[in-house]
Amino acid sequence: MADVKSDIEIARAARKKPIQEIGAGLGIASEHLLPYGHDKAKVSAEFIAEARKRPDGRLILVTAINPTPAGEGKTTTTVGLGDGLNRIGKKAIVCIREASLGPCFGMKGGAAGGGYAQVIPMEDINLHFTGDFHAVTSAHNLLSALIDNHIYWGNELGIDTRRVTWRRVMDMNDRALREIVCSLGGVANGYPREGGFDITVASEVMAILCLAKDLGDLEKRLGDIIVAYRRDKSPVFARDLKADGAMAVLLRDALQPNLVQTLENNPAFVHGGPFANIAHGCNSVMATSTALKLADYVVTEAGFGADLGAEKFFDIKCRKTGLKPAAAVIVATVRALKMNGGVKKEDLGAEDVDALIRGCANLGRHIENIKQFGVPAIVAINHFETDTPAEIEAVRAYVGAQGEEAVLCRHWAEGSAGIEELAHKVVALAESRASQFAPLYPDNMPLFEKINTIVRRIYRGSRAVADGTVLAQLKQWEDQGYGHLPVCMAKTQYSFSTDSNLRGAPVDHVVPVREVRLSAGAGFVVAICGEIMTMPGLPRAPSAEKIFLNEAGYIEGLF
C-alpha cells in the first residue's frame, strides 16, 4: 500500500486561489473583503446587510451517530459534500465552525476536515486563524475584570460575592483551572472569592457571537448577560456594569464571517466555534444566513452526534432564526458502529458483522430522532480502508430496513469524485420539498419539562432528575420571565445517556441534571448533566507532544 499523506501534507500541497477570486465567484467585490493575508478574509457588514434582500438557497445539515473519541469525519463529510455539490453543477457553500486550541493540542485534533476534503489554510484555521477566539476570550474576561473591579471600588450594585456566576475563560484544556480562589494576596488585590475557568468555546460570549444577527443585536445580547445576583436574588446584568459597549468593540470584527476555500477551490465560511457537548454546537447565524443568500445549497454541520448537535441546531439555532433545513445527512462509520456494538477500540480493524449489526441500533435511533423534527434524512457511510464489503452491505441493509438510504462515500481519499452519488441524492431529497421542520417542544413549556422532553424523546431515558436547588432555580427564572427559552443540554457525546461507556441505544436510563446556568444574552438555559465539564482536561498523551516545527520551519503533527 502506498504511503498515505497526512492531512497537513495534503493541505500544504494545495493550489490555492487568491481569496478575492473566491469572493468574486460569490459576487463579493474586493472592497467588501477584509483580507487576512492572501487566502482568508472577512466579509464586510455592509455587504451582508445588502445581501439580506436576496432569496435563500437550501440548507443541508450534516450530523452523525455517537462518535468514537477520534471523531467520525463529520466535518470531512460536510466539506466533501460541498465540493460534491459544486462538482455536479450546483452553487454550494460550506459553513463550519472554527477550531479550538483545546482539542487541537488535546485528543480530537483540528476542525478543518481531513484527507482530500479539507478547508484551507488548514494550519491557520486550526490555530489562531483571524483572531476571533482571542476576541471572544478578551471580551469575556473584560467582563470578569469589570465585575471584580466594581466589587473592589465599593460594590455600588450590591453584588453578593457568593453569587457571582460569571467565570473566566481560556481557549485551552486545563483541568487545574476548573475551580480557583481569586483576589488572594491582601487588600490591594480585592475581596477573595471562589471562581473558575471554562474553555472559550463554552463561553456565553461565543454563543452570542454565533446567534447575533448584527452589531446592534450583538450589543443588546451582551448587555443581557447575567453576571451575578444580589442578596435579594435579583440579577445583575453586564449593562449594569457598563460593559456591553466595550465588549462589542472587542467583538466588532469577530462578528464578520471568515471566507476561505476548500482544497478544490470552492467557498467556505468558517465562523464561530461553540462545542456541542457543553454549548450549542453550531457555526454562526451570520455565516449561515449570508451563505444562504449567495448559493443554491449551504452545507453546515452541528457538533458530535444528532442527540447533541442536531437537536440544538433545530431547537436553538433554527428556532431563534427561522432557518428551515431542507434535508439532513447522518454520517456513520463502520468502526463507530462496531464500537457501539461492543468492540474494543484496538480491535476495530477486524471484521465483525455481528457487532456491527448490534451497533446499528445507535444509527437507527439517530434516524428516528431526525424524523421527529420533520426533516428528511440520508445516511453517509464515511469509508475507512479497514471496512469490508460485508460490513458495508450490512449497514446498507440495516438502513434500508428503516426505510432510508445509505450511500458509501470516499471523499477522504478521492475528494468530490468520491461523494458525487451522495450529492445527487441530497439534491433530490432537498428538491422533493419533503421537509416539514418543527422544533421538538413549544416555547411555553416549563423549563424542566423541556429537559424531560429531550431526555425521553431524544435520549430515550425514563426521566431527568434534579435536586431541589436546581428545580427552585428553574422556577425562579420562569418567574423572572425566562421560561420561554430553549434548553441547551451539556452531557457526554459518546452515549445517549450520561455514562460515556454505555454505547448503542440504551433505554430507560435516568439523566441527572447536576447544575443549570442561565445564558440570558444567548437566549437559552444550560442543563449540565452527569459528569460533563465545561473546562476539559488533557488526555494522558496529548496531541501537543507530537506537534513541532521541522528544520524548515514548517508545522508537523497537526491534524
Swiss-Prot record:
Its EC number is 6.3.4.3. ATP binds at T68, P69, A70, G71, E72, G73, K74, T75. CDD domains: FTHFS. Pathway: One-carbon metabolism; tetrahydrofolate interconversion. It catalyses: (6S)-5,6,7,8-tetrahydrofolate + formate + ATP = (6R)-10-formyltetrahydrofolate + ADP + phosphate. GO terms for biological process: tetrahydrofolate interconversion. Keywords: ATP-binding, Ligase, Nucleotide-binding, One-carbon metabolism. PROSITE patterns: FTHFS_1, FTHFS_2. GO terms for molecular function: ATP binding; formate-tetrahydrofolate ligase activity. Belongs to the formate--tetrahydrofolate ligase family. This is Formate--tetrahydrofolate ligase.
